[in-house]
C-alpha cells in the first residue's frame, strides 16, 4: 500500500506541475488544504475516494488517468 501512495503522489505532482499549478492553486480548486496536497504528493497518505473526482476535475483528467503510472 505504501508503494501505491508514493506512486500516486509522484504522479499527482507531475500532473500538477505540467499544468503550471502550485499546491495552493490545486488546493483551492479542490477544496483541500495545501497540507493535504503536500502529504499526498509525498506519499504520506493517499486521497479519499470523494477527493479523487475533485482532483481529476481540477487537473482536467478522468480519475483513472491519475493512476497511469510508468
Can you annotate each of these PLM segments?
Residues 6, 17-18, 45-46:
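Short amphipathic helical patch at the helix-1/turn junction of helix-turn-helix
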Residues 12, 26-27, 37-40, 66:
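Conserved hydrophobic/aromatic packing and binding residues within compact polymer-binding modules
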Residues 2, 57, 67-70:
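Short, charged recognition helix plus adjacent turn
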Residues 10-29, 54:
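Short basic helix-loop element that most often maps to the first helix and adjoining turn
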Residues 31-47:
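Recognition helix of helix-turn-helix/homeodomain-like DNA-binding domains
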Residues 1-7:
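A detector for short, charged/polar N-terminal pre-domain segments
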Residues 50-65:
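DNA major-groove recognition helix of helix-turn-helix/homeodomain DNA-binding modules
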Amino acid at each position: 500500500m505504501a508503494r501505491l501512495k508514493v506512486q500516486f503522489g509522484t504522479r499527482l505532482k507531475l500532473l500538477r506541475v505540467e499544468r503550471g499549478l502550485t499546491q495552493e492553486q490545486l488546493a483551492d480548486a479542490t477544496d483541500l488544504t495545501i497540507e493535504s496536497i503536500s502529504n499526498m504528493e509525498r506519499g504520506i497518505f493517499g486521497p479519499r475516494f470523494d477527493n479523487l473526482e475533485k482532483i481529476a476535475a481540477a487537473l482536467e483528467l478522468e480519475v483513472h488517468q491519475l493512476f497511469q503510472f510508468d
